[in-house]
């Protein structure tokens, strides 16, 4: 057949020796397309002999591989699935043998699991269907027998619903089983102990010629190491007794067990010798001597002054007559406690000496500050004060009568001047209290202005207050330990004010411009002080006028 219809084709030629002269045979031998189709449709006959195989001398012989053969692969797969199916069938057969259709058994009434319990549970069945007398009698007897057995004999732990306090027989039965099990276990535990006891002592197998050899053997091989109880180490366990309790005599003491780290180790106790004790005490004494003989450096301001001698009581040791400590090899606990007490007393005495030195230094500092303040008070005078020939303060410490005389003399001296507002800077702050009546502190305005007397001494414009000026590090800053309490130190630090020298030389630069050193602060407090002085002067004037008998105009309030 041609591959395409457009290509020309011709029928094949007749074979050699074929004669086509006969027209009839020619017409018969002429084949058509129909004949060719039939030829194709007819199956090929099986060959009687195998066709000659082609000679493949030029190709290499190839081994047969079963994996590449599709037929072999199909056979393998079929056999594999056949095995799986066979295994499933066998498993189903096993399950079918074990399986019980309990629902079918209950329907047929042949369920063996519930034969015993059905007799007890089906009480209502006797009333539903009227049984025969014989069946009723046998069923009732059987049921009564089961009840009696369960009551007196007790069931077993698996099939009995236990009720606390009711199953007496079962309880006794279980107790007996437990006791028998415990007895068996004890016997099993005792058996190996008895067997070990029966073992022969190895010492009997050895023959000793001398007693010394036997003793050496026993010391080497039979010496048992003593078992130490860890709770009974030195200092490990102690008894705590509450002595304040009323029933301390009869009460059981509490046991206190300390940690191993808190207890002294046995090695440290055994290795400590007398030489170690002596060395430790010597180092301690030398450290005390080093601390006690330390000389204190004198400050710059104290260099010119003579050193104040310490009173002999300060250096007196309370253990002066005891003598030097000589350690002994064996010390009783009481001696150790006494020694510790002495050491504590020495430490306390040393601390007291140091505290006395500090207190003495602080007292000197305070005294110097007081002297400096007195000198500054002498230099200072009020703006309103009249000039005096003698600036020395009057001595008012002559007794209670001298203060009254002083007030009287001042009143007589300044009786004529109604607007006198000055005050005198006195030596001690107690004098201000004594002169309180003169300045009107006893009148009704005193409680409104409690700080009047302290603020009346206004600095003069002519002189500069150098107390706040930074004097450099001549005196040295006062530290925390120069004060007794933290509150005093905090108050000192809060009130501390120091301006540089440049502020007194060139003035302080403020927001409104540079102010000179004659700068005087005008605030509300100063204004109130001035008004109070005027009011107090008017009140004093009226009092004097009333005392003289002059009629004074009284306010209407």
Swiss-Prot record:
Please list the residues that carry the modification N6-acetyllysine: 98, 137
GO biological process annotation, one example? mRNA splicing, via spliceosome
Q: Which GO terms describe its cellular component?
A: chromosome; cytoplasm; nucleoplasm; nucleus; spindle pole; U2-type precatalytic spliceosome
Question: Which Pfam families does the record match to this protein?
Answer: RED_C, RED_N
Task: Tell me if DNA-binding is a UniProt keyword of this record.
Answer: no
Numbered residues of crosslink Glycyl lysine isopeptide (Lys-Gly) (interchain with G-Cter in SUMO2) = 151, 310, 331, 386, 388, 404, 408, 496, 501, 509, 541, 543, 553
Composition bias, kind Basic and acidic residues: at what positions?
16-25, 304-313, 332-398
Q: Where is this region: 17 X 2 AA tandem repeats of R-[ED]?
A: 342-375
Q: Where is the composition biased (Basic residues)?
A: 294-303
Q: Where is this region: Disordered?
A: 1-90, 181-205, 294-402
Name the domain of life.
Eukaryota
Q: Where in the cell is it found?
A: Nucleus; Nucleus, Nucleoplasm; Chromosome; Cytoplasm, Cytoskeleton, Spindle pole
Tissue-by-tissue expression: Ubiquitous.
Q: Where is the composition biased (Low complexity)?
A: 42-53
Q: Where are the sequence repeats?
A: 342-343, 344-345, 346-347, 348-349, 350-351, 352-353, 354-355, 356-357, 358-359, 360-361, 362-363, 364-365, 366-367, 368-369, 370-371, 372-373, 374-375
Question: Which keywords has UniProt assigned to this entry?
Answer: Acetylation, Chromosome, Cytoplasm, Cytoskeleton, Isopeptide bond, mRNA processing, mRNA splicing, Nucleus, Phosphoprotein, Repeat, Spliceosome, Ubl conjugation
Question: Where Phosphoserine occurs along the chain?
Answer: 287, 417, 460, 536
Q: How does it assemble?
A: Component of the spliceosome B complex. Interacts with SMU1. Interacts with MAD1L1. May interact with DHX15.
Family, per the entry? Belongs to the RED family.
The job of this chain, per UniProt, is described as:
Involved in pre-mRNA splicing as a component of the spliceosome. Auxiliary spliceosomal protein that regulates selection of alternative splice sites in a small set of target pre-mRNA species. Required for normal mitotic cell cycle progression. Recruits MAD1L1 and MAD2L1 to kinetochores, and is required to trigger the spindle assembly checkpoint. Required for normal accumulation of SMU1.
| Protein name (database record) | Protein Red
